[in-house]
Design a protein with these regions (language model features):
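Active-site acidic/histidine proton-transfer and metal-coordination neighborhood
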Residues: 1-94
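Histidine-acidic metal/acid-base catalytic patches
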Residues: 22, 77-194
Length: 194
C-alpha cells in the first residue's frame, strides 16, 4: 500500500510542475490505519517514502510539504523536526494546520503556545501554507469539528508566531468550510491572517 501511495505522488510531480503549482502536500498516515505498527515504525516508513519522493521533487523543481497531525505518524513538532533534519532536502516544506497539532492533552492555550514556540523556532521558515479549521474535544477526548468561533485552537498565538517568520505572505486555506458560514468565517479569519 505504501508503494502504491508513493507511486501516486511520483506520478503527480510532473503535473504539479506543468501546472506551475510549485508545491504538493500530504498529511502522514493515521495511526488507526496502521494496526500493530508503532509510531517509530510508521515514521521510518514515512522517511522511506520521502526518500523516494524528494529526489524526484528536487529534479523537477517542485516543493513537497508534509503536515503534522497529532494522531498520525508525524504527530508533534519534534517529529516534524526529525523528518526535516533526517531528509535534509531543500524541497521539503511544512503545511501548518494549527488544529492538527492540538490533541486533547494540548488543548489549553498555554500548551498551544508552547507548541507554536517550537514550530516557529525549529522550522517556521519552512512553512509554505496554512490550513484553517475549527475543532474541539468532548469530555472523553473525542475530537469533533466546530465553527471557527467555537474552536479550542489558539489562532491568535499561532498567527502571532507566523508574523515573526521571514515569509512575506502565506496562503491560508479554509478547510471543512460550510458555504452558509462563508461571511462569518471570512470575518473571523481576517482577525488573524496577515
Amino acid at each position: 500500500k505504501r508503494r502504491a501511495e508513493v507511486a501516486k505522488v511520483l506520478s503527480q510531480i510532473p503535473v504539479a510542475r506543468a501546472l506551475g503549482a510549485g508545491c504538493m502536500g500530504s498529511e502522514t498516515t493515521n495511526m488507526a490505519k496502521q494496526p500493530g505498527v508503532t509510531r517509530k515504525e510508521a515514521q521510518e516508513a514515512l522517511l522511506r517514502s520521502l526518500g523516494e519522493i524528494l529526489p524526484a521533487c528536487e529534479e523537477q523543481g517542485v516543493l513537497f510539504a508534509v503536515e503534522c497531525v497529532y494522531y498520525h505518524a508525524m504527530n508533534t513538532p519534534e517529529a516534524v523536526r526529525m523528518v526535516l533534519d533526517t531528509m535534509a532536502s531543500p524541497n521539503l516544506r511544512v503545511i501548518c494546520d494549527f488544529a492538527n497539532y492540538v490533541g486533547p492533552e494540548a488543548a489549553s492555550v498555554d500548551a498551544q503556545r508552547r507548541i507554536w514556540d517550537k514550530v516557529g523556532s525549529w522550522y517556521g521558515d519552512k512553512i509554505t501554507a496554512i490550513h484553517f479549521k475549527g475543532q474541539n474535544f468532548q469530555p472523553d477526548g473525542t475530537l469533533y469539528s466546530t465553527s471557527l468561533e467555537d474552536s479550542c485552537v489558539d489562532y491568535a498565538g499561532g498567527f502571532e508566531m507566523l508574523r515573526q517568520m521571514p515569509q512575506a505572505s502565506l496562503p491560508v486555506l479554509r478547510e471543512e468550510a460550510v458555504p452558509a458560514r462563508a461571511a462569518s468565517d471570512l470575518a473571523f479569519m481576517r482577525r488573524f491572517a496577515y
